Amino acid sequence: MNFIGKILGFIIGYRFGGLFGGIAGLILGHIADKKLYELGSVNSSFFSKKITRQSLFMQTTFAVLGHLSKAKGRVTEEDIQLANNLMSQMQLDVANRQLAQNAFNRGKEADFPVREVIREFRIGCGQRADLLRMFLHIQVQAAFADSNLHNNEKELLFVIAEELGLSRFQFDQMLAMEMAARQFTQGGFYRQQQYQQQSHQQYNQENYQNSYRTSSGPTVEDAYKVLGVNAGDNQQTVKRAYRRLMNEHHPDKLVAKGLPKEMMEMAKEKAQQIQAAYDLICKVKGWK
């Protein structure tokens, strides 16, 4: 809840008008708080008439996850468990967990209007590219959770990407980046139980280095794909790409723009992948 308007209204009203002035200020402050809340909310014809951006992001995420699960032909127990695990990892309260479950179930329906839902989501997010890419990142991670990307899943992911404003080339490039990034976190957020223990902790370079160790280990070619650069690019070009991606996936900035705080660990994981890829390139190239 927002109380700033009420508090300021009462203080100012009381100072200039005593008790009655304070009460009047409290009422005006309440109206101001309500207006400010509405400015931070959006319309949604699918979920509810008025919804916060954070709730829109969360519910759209699970609705599309449900639709993505159905794209393979049928929703398996593993798909349902994956969604439930994600809800647990996000530490959703009872009310939000129910919203997420309802959204997932609605997404499984044959007549789920995926394009319409994504269009509303894009508008609701203010068409912020970083938020939209984070949303797509989550969906791609889910599709790869079983280490196998079904053709129908890939085509649905492109439909989502297209509605978010990406071209086929941009989508294919992002898919390659995401596939390479998985090498730096042993399969992605959905298979990383340790992130539950690391919630809300400050990560550092040691965490980055430890987080991407796999049985085979990521290659420098994977690192180039994660940053979207070429092997022949100079240090300035690579650093520019690294800084741009880190800025786009900064957890605190994403939350401030509308990413639910419960999804901050996903943003942290993406930042870890980017950092680990950059560190590996610098090590191989001998860059300081």
From Swiss-Prot:
GO cellular component, one term: plasma membrane
Residue stretches in coiled coil: none
Record protein name field: Co-chaperone protein DjlA
Function: Regulatory DnaK co-chaperone. Direct interaction between DnaK and DjlA is needed for the induction of the wcaABCDE operon, involved in the synthesis of a colanic acid polysaccharide capsule, possibly through activation of the RcsB/RcsC phosphotransfer signaling pathway. The colanic acid capsule may help the bacterium survive conditions outside the host.
Cytoplasmic side: 31-288
Domain J as annotated: residue spans: 222-288
GO molecular function terms noted in the UniProt entry: protein-folding chaperone binding
Subcellular location: Cell inner membrane
Transmembrane segments: 7-30
Quaternary structure and partners: Homodimer.
Topology of this chain in the membrane: Single-pass type III membrane protein
PANTHER family cross-referenced by the UniProt entry: CO-CHAPERONE PROTEIN DJLA
Protein keywords: Cell inner membrane, Cell membrane, Chaperone, Membrane, Transmembrane, Transmembrane helix
